[in-house]
Regions:
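Conserved ankyrin/ankyrin-like repeat signature
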Residues: 36-37, 88-92, 141-145, 189-190
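Ankyrin-repeat boundary/"N-cap" motif
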Residues: 9-28, 51-80, 106-132, 159-177
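Leucine-rich solenoid repeat scaffolds
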Residues: 146-197
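Short coil/linker segments at helix-helix boundaries
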Residues: 79-90, 127-143
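Ankyrin repeat domain, specifically the short helix-to-loop turn at the C-terminus of the second helix
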Residues: 1-7, 12-13, 39-48, 92-102, ...
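Long, low-complexity, intrinsically disordered N-terminal extensions of eukaryotic proteins, enriched
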Residues: 2-6, 19-23, 27-31, 181-199
């Protein structure tokens, strides 16, 4: 790889229906949590803002910049109580931003990095019975990631104003309630975190 810099940004385009079609080695390494390989690839010219080409990936696939993959990794690791792994993903988010990843680049379904972090945290926080042991660390992780994204230029206003649910994120998360079983507002946990952060 060190002799062929282009290799770190090449993508698999084979005909077999594999998940890595259209992904760069960096993207695959991030999804697999191979942090030494990630470091090596970035040091050798891998694109920290790489995103799959929608024309190459299987139909109906969501294409996303590698920054989003790292954000997902930080929360997915928590679901398996892999706390050190989750911390490594947070550090990777910082590294990707330092290398030039765009903190405002959307997925092919228009999700901003802030939105990806909020969505991932909300998934856990709204399922307290399924994830009782990671509620507090999920809140902490969300704030850490938001801090990094905003430090490197993420546009809070763009996310708040974005009409993603038929209403703005501001209305969806701060004003609307969503009642689950036992008439409990399952959106309240994420709302409390976001109100403390955005207000």
């Amino acid at each position: 790889i060190s002799k062929n810099i282009k290799a770190v940004n090449e993508v698999y385009t084979g005909k077999a229906p594999k998940k890595d079609i259209g992904q760069s080695p960096l993207q695959v390494a991030i999804k697999c949590g191979e942090f030494e390989i990630i470091e090596f690839l970035l040091e050798n010219g891998a694109d920290p803002d790489f995103m799959e080409n929608p024309e190459v990936v299987p139909p109906h696939s969501v294409c996303m910049p590698v920054l989003h993959d790292a954000i997902i990794g930080a929360f997915s690791a928590l679901c398996y109580k892999q706390y050190m792994q989750s911390e490594k993903y947070v550090n990777l988010i910082k590294i990707l931003l330092e290398y030039g990843a765009n903190p405002n680049r959307k997925t092919s379904s228009e999700i901003l990095p802030i939105g990806m972090a909020v969505n991932q945290a909300d998934f856990i926080l709204s399922r307290k019975s399924a994830y009782p042991d990671i509620q507090e660390i999920t809140q902490k992780r969300l704030l850490e990631i938001l801090d990094l994204l905003i430090e490197y230029g993420a546009d809070k206003k763009e996310w708040l104003d974005q009409d993603f649910w038929g209403v703005s994120n501001k209305v969806h998360y701060f004003e609307e309630k969503q009642y689950g079983t036992n008439n409990i507002d399952i959106r309240e946990p994420i709302r409390i975190v976001l109100e403390g952060y955005f207000h």
